[in-house]
Amino acid sequence: MSNQVTKSDNSEPLAPAGEPAIRVIAMPANTNADGRMFGGWLMGMLDQAAGLVAARHALARVVTVAADSITFHAPVQVGDELSLYARLVKVGRTSMKIEVEGWRRVRHELETIKAISGLFTFVAIDEDRRPCQVPPMNETRLLSDKADK
């Protein structure tokens, strides 16, 4: 993702700039036997964040049609804060591609670590649940969305 905040030595980014689409605390109910968060729960959180961005752009109902890629970068533990940043990267006639990154933070520390990332495809649907046209992706709309953050 662009606009990342970096450490003072300009090495690894700390997290994307702006406000996350979703911020949650990892809870015990969503863990595996090792005390780490289930991959399925993490993927669901990415899908929710991407869906919020897609629905906001389409101004319509949206459905997930593909999880084009998902990469696990670091484990998420119980009690970690997970911040999900999502952005629109491509728009078709009825579809949208959304890039999402999930960054974990131990609740009593400042450092953030990229835990998961993915690319999702959504389709906008009308009242009859048929694909409907979405607005084009243009600079004016993208700039106004960034100003909202």
Curated annotation (Swiss-Prot):
GO terms for cellular component: cytosol. Its EC number is 3.1.2.-. InterPro entries: Cytosol_ACT, HOTDOG_ACOT, HotDog_dom_sf, Thioestr_dom. GO terms for molecular function: long-chain fatty acyl-CoA hydrolase activity. It is an enzyme of class 3 (hydrolase). Residues 16-128 form the HotDog ACOT-type domain. Coiled coil: none annotated. Keywords: Hydrolase. GO terms for biological process: acyl-CoA metabolic process; fatty acid catabolic process. Belongs to the acyl coenzyme A hydrolase family. This is Uncharacterized acyl-CoA thioester hydrolase ZMO0511. It comes from Zymomonas mobilis subsp. mobilis (strain ATCC 31821 / ZM4 / CP4).
